[in-house]
Amino acid sequence: NEPAAYNTELKPGGGWDMWRKIAAQDPSFGHPDKFCSDPEQTNWMSATVETLDQRIIPYIKNICKRDPFTGKVVTGGIVTVKDSSWLMSWTINRQPQFREQPKDHCLVWVYSLFTDKPGDYVKKTMRECTGKEICMEWLYHIGVPVDEIEDMAEHSANTVPVMMPYIDAFFMPRAYGDRPKVVPDGAVNFAFLGQFAETPRDTIFTTEYSMRT
């Protein structure tokens, strides 16, 4: 019943702090501030909706044309609400996702790209919304009657939001050299791994990219 914390502090000892200290030693070690200096450009927000009864399920079935409790594919990918002011998307993977998950509960992953714009049903920005309010916005977009939305968000779902200030950092505009080479020129006994290491002809945002570095 509270909005997710929006904490942009880069704490000492964290990954960004370490990269800054490394980069200060040589220009070839990259420029981390190109990626971590503007959280308004790099933040992204999501929420996990857990259905608690069968009231929401028919609306999911109506869109997916699948029963989420068969143990098979449900959405088959991301469902994007094109006319959402938040540019909301949601997806449901094979259920159950966790061993202890009740068999009649469904987990839905909801996220939005525009966390600073008012919603279409809840007239608040996503970052200002509680989990319940985010659920209400989602229920509105999947076709739940307006007079049932608040009650269903309150009693038929449990929604937990999370704000990630730097999750889109690797998409920030950059120049060659802003990311260090995996093995910088002249390096002998060290290398850079992960999303912020420069790898030719490859695209970030995947686990595979990190593994290939």
Label the model's feature ranges.
Residues N1-R212:
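C-terminal segments that line or cap access tunnels to active or ligand-binding sites in enzymes
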